[in-house]
């Protein structure tokens, strides 16, 4: 093999680039130098250690890359050293591509140089990526020489993709370049449908390489939206639970934010990135930041995680954190469900404001006076929600259950906290023996969901639970003895239940349920009237009797001004307090946490004296929003102002202001005129009802008693009423 002379050009082939340069002489030598060998001398002397000749193929063309030698060696015809492998796996030094650009001009005489060998066409292609500030230099990431399927060589410079380049959509660079290359190669022979498929593939790949940060943010937003909103029951329970947690001794390190300067822990902000405490959670809860109960639970878990991360679990603060976490998890089991069916009071049936067809003004008889429809009426009453009486009963049941769930009874009450798990307890035949299981947790859930219709239903479930215990566990076993102990506690608590007055309940029910479904109608006629089974008559009659009694008292013996004022204040006045604001309730609840033992005892005495149902209880827990105004202001002035007498002074001042607003009392003449107007109104109702024959038996009896005769005309109503009044 002999060197080949090419006129006017000096072509040198390195492991990474072929360069050309014009020369002044008549001929030039095509030479190469091997990586790792000394560079060729500049004085024109050739060294065998630095050069090896470029051979010719059988057809006389140049073999720049040693393909013919490689083929001969594979066939066993040539035993010389193979130099082509040094090109396929280059080693430093390399040529730097940073000074070049794809748009830089090339020499006109070598712009389209091709070398043919072995009847195959070899193309030399220079390819480089865009310069990037984040890419490494060419010495650490050199260009690579790759042989393609069409036997062409490609020099490419690669650089790793840094994590920062994944932001702002930079991750699509490699994918887009590859898709554009495939698309350009396929555009020559592919159909339009194939090109459309390539476009869709590229679009899909760009979506797959979307920013991971954006996907994380979207996932967090979706998780945040999927939590159910906090219900009223959950809000009340979490408020009480948070107050109870802050009241315990183990919560002392967690009541306020950590002060690194004051506590001399400068590394705390470095270790704990998201600090949280009970005081901050109380503020967030009061301002309505927690839209879901899960958000509150997440903050509580974050507080415990921060504690264990910085203090460990064996330090004093870590032990207090574990105790507080155990209390929180135990209370969290009783959290009401987020999916609670709301019980709403059925509204009134809309009254008809138009006359019936045919102009006939008829009125349905009240169902309460009809024996035939009594069953329907009772059914309609059964559909109504329970009134205040039932609420008081359920509150007592809740207090009994709360007492049984206290920690002091845990030693013998824990088997009844949750439903029996036959697998965990090792009693697979439990449900074969016990057909209707019951436990305290199920009863608590039923109370929270208003599933008990009365106290008897609650008591029946409690008796059922103990009955199941004695049925499955024979006498003398530990669980049987625990059930006996817990049942004795329940019997003592149940024996102290208040005596709910049935007559009071019936009176409240009748007041709240009368005319609930609107049995009367208003007719569109010249003489409109509203008739609700005589209630208007009774109201007018009560006003008449009230004014008559006042008038009779004025005509009686004269009393002194001081005595009369005192009697009027006793009979007509009540202590009126200003409205209780939400800020006052929060202030009272906060200040109660910092009272001493003596102050708490005095507050308990105030509550027991004002609320009889708390007199026999050892521990008092009352909702601030449910306290009567007089009791609230007594406790509020004592706890927040330090002056218990201020509440009475406030009530007196409010009453005096109210009396001034009422104005002067009516004189005898004015009261007589008021009585006359009320009687005229009563006579008008009575006359219309008699003329239309639509008055029920009770109203007719009332007219007979008050007017004397049902046959009197409307013109004589005034005289008949006067005669009946004089009689």
UniProtKB/Swiss-Prot annotation:
Compositionally biased tracts (Acidic residues): 56-68, 712-727
Residue positions where Phosphoserine is found in the record: 162
Disordered: region residues: 27-231, 341-369, 699-727
GO biological process: chromatin remodeling; DNA repair-dependent chromatin remodeling; heterochromatin boundary formation
Record domain NET: where: 570-650
Alphabetical UniProt keywords: Bromodomain, Nucleus, Phosphoprotein, Repeat
GO cellular component: chromatin; nucleus
CDD domains associated with the record: Bromo_BDF1_2_I, Bromo_Brdt_II_like
Principal subcellular localization: nucleus
Keyword Transport (UniProt): no
Protein name, per record: Bromodomain-containing protein C631.02
Organism: Schizosaccharomyces pombe (strain 972 / ATCC 24843) (Fission yeast)
High-level lineage: Eukaryota, Fungi, Dikarya, Ascomycota, Taphrinomycotina
